[in-house]
Amino acid sequence: EFGEKFAKNIAKVLRGYTKFNGRRKPENLFPHVLSIVNNNEADRVLAEYEEITELAEEIYEKLPKERKDAYYQLVLYPTKASYLMYKLHICTAKNRLYAKQGRVSANRYAKMVNEAFVQDYIMSEYYNKTMAKGKWDGMMNQAHLGQTGWRSAEVNMMPKLELVSPKGGGGKMFVALPDSDEVVDSGTYELDAFSNIGDETRSIVIGNQGDSPVDYTVTADQSFIKIRIRRFNNTDAFVTETAKGSTYEDNIVDVCIDWSKIPAGKKSVDGNLTINGTGKTVVIKVKADVYDVSRLPKNTFVDTNGVISIEAEHYSENVSLGGGEWKVIDDYGRSLSSMKVFPTELAVKKPGVDSPYLEYHFTANETGKMTLYTYCAPTNNLSADLGMKYSVAIDDEKPQIVETFANTLPVGSGEVWDSGVMMNCRILATQHELNKKEIHTLRIYMVDAGFTLQKLVIDCNESIKESFLGPQESYFTK
């Protein structure tokens, strides 16, 4: 339709926006859905969407005039309109939190929400009135912003926003730490430990609650700590001593580790970052742990912080039994892909007897009770007399059979179905016990063939941070 020259990139755009919208339909987006605090989730998702939107726009500009209307309808509009929905809701969430914190930058995000709202209107009007000379006038009339129930709103409605009046008396520095919705201007705090096996950067915000710019310095007391300043319009290079800045709104301090500066044989090192500005001082402890994974088998996931997150397709063993075989479903699920047994009409199987299974290996730094969260597709039972079950076992324990969607769901339990539809996922928790520190084996058995596995998250010490997509995948040996 649009020529071989553009086929590969158009396919990338279409795969991207259908995958991203599969996580959560745009009409079911709200400001609270994605976390703007934990796991850098909202910013990561928006950056992914921005990348494919920019690609879609680049293609549009290069297409011949006679192809632009069809491309706008089939590719550019659904991609960019979805991106604008994500941007509007994420910026709304930031505006509300930052206003609560007294941050001057709340006003910038209010402006960005207004801009996204106007852009959405302009795109819909172009679709209705200009594209193909108005052939599809009215197609994009349905309101999609301000939804409060199952019926669509009559008109698009702007979300409620907050504006901040800066405090008088000059600049007033604050610091916002990763994975926290609090801001501080004094005291000593600690970042999550860095590990040499992950490409890790932690980001700290230095911001302002006052009516004039904040001048600040960030000083590292150890040469292995690298820091850089990131602003809305440019990013400095990493340095290993002192970084300086001035901001009326927010600057971001990225922190990472220069592993070449850690002495050989050291398993753990510590240092401090000191942030000074407007007469305030905040000290942040930095810890770096060195892991030796050279002797671990291939595809072993490594525990570095009490949480092990595993994408379904990164198994160690895929064992076919009873006529069933686990296969990858690309681009389906919260993040990477999913695994499902085929053929779908396969009869119920018994774990440990004739059930095909996936096996995963992981290390754990602690023993005792732990929780496994299994992310699966919100598939309903495939027949009236069956549920939708899978089975799970860790190490030598007896397999637990887990019901994801009962065939006899009680009247009044519609929220189970509703939640699955809204989230395009069900998350099931099972309890297990790790008796020793070693490489552990986790098996997921098919019971009902409709079960589709998206990801696994092991929580060893109740340290999972709340987010929509769940923790990013942990390091595993290659």
PLM feature segments, named:
Residues 197-478:
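Extracytoplasmic
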Residues 1-209, 308-329, 339-348, 356-364, ...:
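Catalytic domains of carbohydrate-active enzymes that cleave complex glycans
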